[in-house]
């Protein structure tokens, strides 16, 4: 009995189900999502408990939303799976921007480009979740060394998850990269590496989506120094200086030799994102929850609750509300009565 208690204690500390500790051979993570992450060009084959639980929670949300949307007659994104890696990523990026209603001749607008793009993607029918921790557990941070984002696809619906432990510029690139996965109809866990064909394609797609070639050429002046060109493109596109540098190299505006000199100047600095809280001075609770589960999912659940389509207990579980009062407060901050999913 004492040994069993010790095993249970150890399983809780390791965030591993007790039954898995009893197996002679460690079990594989319970997910079928393709893993495109690499380390030194070799595939990664492990999932931390934090990543595994984040994947499981996201899969559950997409499962629920898929059933709900199909019953309500709500379509998924019209561009899901409309391309493959044989297509030119720049041409597909231009076409995707057009379908999303984004002007080809301008960069993403607004002081918070991540928020802007999240809104555009959710309006198109994609679920977008952002978090830097496992659900609401602040003692379990997500690691950007393990993953930057992932895309889940079920039937004609998709969910994008972004690790907000990353910098804002990296989050923006991740959103665009994961959009590439949606366009390809290819779910997966991403790290923006270059050793996999799909990841390379999605990187090119993201760079083209955020900084279309014609727009870059009209923005960067031939009289600018290479570093000034990098800073200008980074500021206007929302990409990191490193991503802007390689976009300019790809467009033959900066040569490889000059780029190698600039690399130390544009190398990303480690960022430790602070998890928003509903405490005094932080965002309100409903804003935190909306970011974690996504506006579209939040409004679908609250609409279904108010309309009597699902019980409050299920809604509370889907939104992570601990009490009926917490759920009521979340519902009060949703335009659920006027929600339009299409």
Could you say what each language-model-derived stretch is?
Residues 1-342:
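Active-site hotspot residues in diverse enzymes, especially metal/ion-binding acidic/histidine motifs
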């Amino acid at each position: 009995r004492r040994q069993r208690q010790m095993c249970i204690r150890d399983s809780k500390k390791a965030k591993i189900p007790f039954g898995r500790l009893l197996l002679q051979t460690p079990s594989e993570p319970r997910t079928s999502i393709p893993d495109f992450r690499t380390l030194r060009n070799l595939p990664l084959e492990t999932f931390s408990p934090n990543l595994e639980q984040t994947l499981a929670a996201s899969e559950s949300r997409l499962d629920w939303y898929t059933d709900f949307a199909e019953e309500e007659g709500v379509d998924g994104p019209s561009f899901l799976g409309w391309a493959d890696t044989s297509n030119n990523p720049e041409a597909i990026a231009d076409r995707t921007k057009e379908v999303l209603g984004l002007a080809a001749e301008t960069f993403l607008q607004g002081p918070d480009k991540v928020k802007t793009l999240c809104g555009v993607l959710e309006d198109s029918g994609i679920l977008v979740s952002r978090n830097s921790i496992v659900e609401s557990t602040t003692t379990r941070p997500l690691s950007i060394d393990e993953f930057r984002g992932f895309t889940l696809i079920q039937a004609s619906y998709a969910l994008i998850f972004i690790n907000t432990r990353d910098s804002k510029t990296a989050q923006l690139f991740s959103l665009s990269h994961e959009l590439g996965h949606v366009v390809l109809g290819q779910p997966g866990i991403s790290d923006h590496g270059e050793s996999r064909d799909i990841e390379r394609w999605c990187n090119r797609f993201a760079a083209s989506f955020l900084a279309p070639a014609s727009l870059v050429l009209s923005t960067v002046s031939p009289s600018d120094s290479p570093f000034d060109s990098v800073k200008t493109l980074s500021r206007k596109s929302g990409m990191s200086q490193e991503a802007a540098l390689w976009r300019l190299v790809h467009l033959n505006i900066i040569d490889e030799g000059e780029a190698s000199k600039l690399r130390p100047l544009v190398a990303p600095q480690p960022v430790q994102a602070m998890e928003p809280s509903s405490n005094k001075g932080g965002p309100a609770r409903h804003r935190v929850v909306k970011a974690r589960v996504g506006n579209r999912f939040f409004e679908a659940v609250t609409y279904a609750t108010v309309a009597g389509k699902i019980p409050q207990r299920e809604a509370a579980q889907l939104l992570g509300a601990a009490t009926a009062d917490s759920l009521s407060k979340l519902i009060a901050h949703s335009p659920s009565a006027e929600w339009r999913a299409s």
